């Protein structure tokens, strides 16, 4: 199968076993070598497809690049047309729409900002009035408390004096009652 005519008779001679002992051992080794060589060739022809696949790959790459090149050219042309259309038609429309919407949005935002600013001023004024009122009330209460504390010793002295007078009257009353009782106990 290797393509040479001498290989087959050698293999046959080895299979027939013709010849001397020395020749048999040499023939068997040579025949085995030839058989291995034939098996290698069979293997490469049946199972090794590198040359065929390389040719197919080259063909596929060539076809792919040709078709791909045309397809990419069409895609790039379409993209160019879309970009031109966008620049000429869509972009000005978008700018106009954006500017119109942006102006309206800015006006609303300014109105909302002014409204919030007024609300904050009112709230600050209200807090200031409340704080001023609280501060004035606190000062007034502090003055009242100080006046109350200043008048406290005098009131205490008055209460103590009244208490002493009441105690003195009670003593006199009890003393008078004791005298009256002493008069009645003699009976």
From Swiss-Prot:
The keyword Nucleotidyltransferase does not apply. Residues 1-27 are annotated as: Disordered. GO terms for cellular component: axon cytoplasm; BLOC-1 complex; microvesicle; transport vesicle. InterPro entries: Bloc1s5. It comes from Rattus norvegicus (Rat). The lineage of its organism: Eukaryota, Metazoa, Chordata, Craniata, Vertebrata. Signal peptide: none annotated. Belongs to the BLOC1S5 family. Octamer composed of one copy each BLOC1S1, BLOC1S2, BLOC1S3, BLOC1S4, BLOC1S5, BLOC1S6, DTNBP1/BLOC1S7 and SNAPIN/BLOC1S8. The BLOC-1 complex associates with the AP-3 protein complex and membrane protein cargos. Interacts with BLOC1S4, BLOC1S6, DTNBP1/BLOC1S7 and PI4K2A. Component of the biogenesis of lysosome-related organelles complex 1 (BLOC-1) composed of BLOC1S1, BLOC1S2, BLOC1S3, BLOC1S4, BLOC1S5, BLOC1S6, DTNBP1/BLOC1S7 and SNAPIN/BLOC1S8. This is Biogenesis of lysosome-related organelles complex 1 subunit 5.
């Amino acid at each position: 199968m290797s393509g040479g005519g001498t290989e087959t008779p050698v293999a046959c001679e080895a299979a027939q076993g013709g010849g001397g002992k020395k020749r048999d051992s040499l023939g068997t080794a040579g025949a085995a070598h030839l058989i291995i060589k034939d098996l290698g060739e069979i293997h490469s022809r049946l199972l090794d497809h590198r040359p065929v696949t390389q040719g197919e790959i080259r063909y596929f790459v060539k076809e792919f690049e040709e078709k791909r090149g045309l397809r990419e050219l069409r895609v790039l042309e379409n993209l160019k047309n879309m970009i031109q259309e966008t620049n000429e038609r869509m972009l000005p429309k978008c700018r106009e729409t954006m500017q119109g919407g942006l102006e309206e949005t800015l006006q609303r935002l300014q109105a909302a900002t002014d409204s919030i600013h007024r609300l904050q001023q009112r709230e600050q004024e209200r807090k200031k009035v409340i704080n001023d009122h609280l501060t004035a009330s606190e000062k007034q209460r502090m003055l009242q408390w100080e006046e109350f504390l200043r008048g406290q010793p005098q009131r205490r002295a008055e209460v103590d004096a009244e208490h002493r007078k009441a105690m003195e009257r009670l003593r006199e009353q009890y003393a008078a009652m004791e005298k009256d009782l002493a008069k009645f106990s003699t009976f």
